[in-house]
Amino acid sequence: MVKKRIYELAKELGISSERVIEIAKKYDFKVTNHMSALDENEQNKIRGSISLKAKKKEHIQHNKNKDNFHSKKVQKSNTGSKDENNHKNVHKNNRKRSGSSMKENNNAKNGQRNNRNNRSNNKFKNKRNNNNKRNNNFKKGNPVPPRKNKPLPETLVYTVGMNVADIAKKIHREPAEIIKKLFMMGVMVNQNQSLDKDTIELLAADYGINAEEKVEVDVSDIDKFFEEEQNNTEHLEKRPPVVTIMGHVDHGKTTLLDKLRHTHVTEGEAGGITQHIGAYQVRHDDKIITFLDTPGHAAFTNMRARGADITDITVLVVAADDGVMPQTIEAINHAKAAGVPIIVAVNKIDKPGANPNHVMEQLTEYELIPESWGGDTIFVEISAKFGKNLDELLDMILLEAEMLELHANPNQRGAGSVIEARLDKGKGSVASLLVQQGTLHVGDPIVVGNTFGRVRTMVDARGYDIKKATPATPVEITGLNEVPDSGDRFITFEDEKTARAAGEKRAERALLKERSQTNHVTLDNLFDTLKEGELKEVGVIIKADVQGSVEALAQSFKKIDVEGVRVNIIHQAVGAINESDVTLAEASNAIIVGFNVRPTPLAKQQAESDNVDIRLHRVIYKAIDEIETAMKGMLEPEYQEKITGQVEIRQTYKVSKLGTIGGGYVIDGYIRRDSGVRVIRDGIVIYEGKLASLKRFKDDVKEVKQGYECGLMIEKYNDIKVGDQIEAYIMEEVPVD
């Protein structure tokens, strides 16, 4: 017995599933919805019922046509008698008119008086009669033209989550009709409710059309697009190499680049040290080389951390008189970690104490062995100051680039990375980009990191306006809504609407990610964190001047136990607090305790930016008490006063039920709505309290800066006078040393 579902039988018979269910229920078949199955006998009965009804319908239609034909004949024969009756009626009407003419003459005067009223009444009557005529047309059964549905499409292209209203538009049907169908299927929805994949496909099957799912591409995933563009191997062409110059401070990196591009960067920079990242191009033997000039290795590392591996070759500059220095080793490690080939430029060979061989010996310890010694590292002895052997260095760079076989497709959409970015007062957001794939054009909609916009202007490395930039070309663009981060990737889109949607979505995700990040523990928030159950142990890094102090602190901390929460010593060592300690504390959410030691300037700066808590002590028991007290929630923060601004009262206004309003001018700093204030008259503090309100014109504001006027009221004080000085201050928390 071949069973068939109701919706399949309905499709075969060319009727709706509801109609089949209705017939099936008349025969007492056990059916519930369009998915119910029918056996062969049940199917035949339904088919028979449909065919019988079709015959009846045909018979009725035939009889109806007969009746219509007969009625038309009758109407024709009656037309003659109607004409005779009309002729008689004309004579009767003429007699009536002659008899009534006398009455009309007598009433003429009265008619003139009531003429005005009659006009208005006639208008009302005509309007009412017209409405009645319309209503009578419907009452008489005049046929209303039926609404014609557009034909169903062959395929319904849908996305998961579409609502009934969207589907109705796609298949040219009313939402009410679809809701009714879904109700018959046992699905209760309204027109704005999202539908899942199965429901949409069942609905399409019920209408007898195909369903095709359209998978939506996440336009905000620019990393995916970037990789697709990178992996596109069609129409590849040779591109210039991108070279980064690295090395120890004052070993001549910028001087070398200055000589290579024939400009004077060094003279214009403070102390001869590079102050920003730049990208420049040099032409040698009719070939172009792109150089990146970094202010330090941190920028290189940050770019790598963001996935921007933009460098093809690293030129390691080592001074022949100084040899290998700490930053030289750091540069080697960064280049090796990035998997970038290294060319060593031994600089300052013109100096009296220069010893290039000693440099080569030192670098062998770091697996950089010269080709002349049987290795594979290119060494070039140069003098950046006098321009000696620079052509040879460029030749070696081009040779290395040839070995790397660098290619890109300029015929696809532009993609690349941010070298640097800044906010310019006149231009707005300005970003230096390196095009890595495709071609970037002026006017292209673009997404850069979590920002978006349209390329408004584009300037090359020489400062000239250009219309397009091909692979390995550094450019400076304007037109972004915000300033991106160095190392961010960029990609262009076909239209600005898509670019905006992608940029806004990325910015939203970044904000959510930032909010969801773990707050670093400090002694001030330690008790609250423990109370919330977020922390089961307190991580501590101990640094002291001698080993004995380190061990004494470690042993004492281990003995602290507050409500089952213990102290975990993550790291302990002798010496100053350095960047590595801060990085470890940031990663492990720990507190740094220093005893008779201080943090290095860089470590202090990093701790402030990473929100890592450093506590410095000279007495051991105070350090122990501080940790224990913080864990018990009894540590009181210390505050100090900070003067933020001064306001001069130039006019006063008395307002009933409110008090005295002082019209002032901010002569220094700023005043905030939440600031504490002092009223100073002739150098004497008259009153100290808080602001009740702060306004600019009629608007309440949070802050008024120097050079602007404001209106203010002080809580519980109405004796403000012209000439008074209002001193604004805030209380800042002081870190415990």
From Swiss-Prot:
Region listing for G3, in residue ranges: 293-296
Q: Which InterPro entries match?
A: EF-G-like_DII (IPR053905), IF2_II (IPR044145), IF2_N (IPR006847), P-loop_NTPase (IPR027417), Small_GTP-bd (IPR005225), T_Tr_GTP-bd_dom (IPR000795), TF_IF2_bacterial-like (IPR000178), TIF_IF2 (IPR015760)
Q: What is its main location?
A: cytoplasm
User: Region (Disordered): which ranges?
Assistant: 55-152
Q: Which residues bind GTP?
A: 247-254, 293-297, 347-350
Which residue intervals make up region (G5)?
Answer: 383-385
What cystine linkages occur within this chain? none
What molecular functions are annotated in GO for this chain?
Answer: GTP binding; GTPase activity; translation initiation factor activity
Q: Which Gene3D superfamilies match?
A: 1.10.10.2480, P-loop containing nucleotide triphosphate hydrolases (3.40.50.300), Translation factors (2.40.30.10), Translation initiation factor IF- 2, domain 3 (3.40.50.10050)
Q: Where is region (G4) located?
A: 347-350
Please state where this protein is localized.
Cytoplasm
Q: What role does this protein play?
A: One of the essential components for the initiation of protein synthesis. Protects formylmethionyl-tRNA from spontaneous hydrolysis and promotes its binding to the 30S ribosomal subunits. Also involved in the hydrolysis of GTP during the formation of the 70S ribosomal complex.
State the protein's name: Translation initiation factor IF-2
Q: Which organism is it from?
A: Ligilactobacillus salivarius (strain UCC118) (Lactobacillus salivarius)
Gene symbol of the encoding locus: infB
